[in-house]
Each structure stands twice: as C-alpha cells, then as structure tokens.
Amino acid sequence: MLNFLKKNSDNQEKTERCFDSSKPVADHIAVIMDGNGRWAQKRMLPRIAGHKEGMNNVKVITKHASKLGVKVLTLYAFSTENWKRPTDEVNFLMKLPVDFFDVFVPELIEENVRVNVMGYKEFLPAHTQKAVENAMEQTKENTGLILNFALNYGSRAEILTAVNDIVALAKSGDLPDEVDEKTFSSHLMTASLGEALQDPDLLIRTSGEERISNFLLWQIAYSELFFTDKYWPDFTTTDLEEAIGSYQLRNRRFGGLKDTTEGDA
Ligand code: V07
C-alpha cells in the first residue's frame, strides 16, 4: 500500500516536471558539463574519448535548446583550475575548439547560432585562440541562440578583474562615488551577452556533484539550480526538457512574477 502510494506520487512528480511548451522557457541556461572522464572510464576508454563524446553532445543539446527557443546557452568548457590536469589531457582539450569549429560551425551557422567565448583567452594556445576567433567571427551576424563558451574562465578571477578595472577607472577620475550592481555587472565577462541576458535563469550540473565550482558566482544569485546524476555525454534532449520543466514548475510557484527577493513567504 505504501509502495503503491509512493509510486503514484513519483509519477505525479514526473508528470508535473514535464516540459510545457505553452509556458516560457528559461531564456539563459548555464551548464557545468561534468562527468566526461567518468563516462569514458566506465567504458574502459581513455578520458579523452569522454571529452570527444561530450563535444558531440554540445552540438545535440545546442540544436535542441535552439529549437525550444532558449536565447543563451552558457557552457563551462574549461576552468582556470583545469590547467592542473595531465598535460596530454590539457593538450587534447585545447584542440577541441579547433575540431568543433571544423565539424560543427557550418551546421550551427545553418541553425542561426552565434558563438561567443568568454574567459582569459590570451592564455590559450595560438591554435585554440584562432579557432575561437574564427567561430565568433563566422557566426557574428547570426541572430538566433547565443552559444556562449566559458573557456579558461573562473568566477573569482572575473570578479577581481572587474574590481581592478573599476579601481583603474576611479584613479583616472572617471567614476561616480558609488558602484551599483548595474555598473559592477557591466565589468563582468557576461556583459558581452547584452543587458537583458547576463544572469542565467537556470543552472544545470551533470554527474551528481552539487557544487558551483567557481562558475558565474555573481550571476547565479537568483538562478534555479538543477542537478542530475547523468554524465554529460549521457545527458539527452529529454533531460534538457526535464530541467526546463522543473524550472517552469518552480517559476510558477512565484505566481509568474519575476521574484528578486529571497524566500517566498
Ligand atoms: C570542450 C567538450 C564538452 C564537454 C566538456 C569539456 C570538453 C566545445 C568547445 C569549444 C570552445 C570554444 C569554441 C568552440 C568550441 C570546447 C573545450 C572543451 C576546451 F569556440 N567543447 N569543448 N572547448 N569539451
């Protein structure tokens, strides 16, 4: 009897969490694409095979997000901490933007996707920088989904860069006495997305970890968080719809008002 009740309530929860095409989708979705190495190890493959599979999934999820009407997809591709990984793995990762450019950019152009890259690009190898520049240049006229890669990105470093930029402005006498949220945000890397799209509505992390790991700390102040045990290469378009469905359900609890105060008393 108890089991029956439990099953019933699980089913109900699943139905409620379903994507609803009549409700607004999350405009800006950020993803921590975790679990590529573990996906490979589970299959007795080298970790780099997981990264390659993860890259293929970027294309699949981007296309589906674009179809659903998502405006920005921000993907954590390489963190400032990832340099500590074995040299061979880092070298392989640094080639992925090149591969991605060759294999997927023509398809994404057809899909009207614009590629943007934020992060400390100047520290990337020359061939990676070139691929990034090409991807951004060749898609700059596109007006559809913005595929925003965080590459050599770290949120604390981003915040400190913003502080230092503001200090430099203040020294040159170019700043009002007080810095407000809007001014501060305009110095963050997400400012390149345009004023309305800087903060993610929904943050997804795959692979079972429930941490933020130095990703968009300022920008996720009001974001809904969605964690799944699936490894990134196994994360499907249905999983994306489930994450958006969960966002739509939680958003509905605020009565359709854009809530910017903590707690929902
Ligand atoms: C990377 C594939 C996705 C899973 C997570 C880590 C590995 C796409 C890019 C990329 C970046 C910039 C760009 C075009 C493509 C990428 C890295 C790793 C370093 F302009 N996937 N992907 N870059 N992975």
Mark where each language-model region is.
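Flexible, compositionally biased loop and terminal segments
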Residues: 1-265
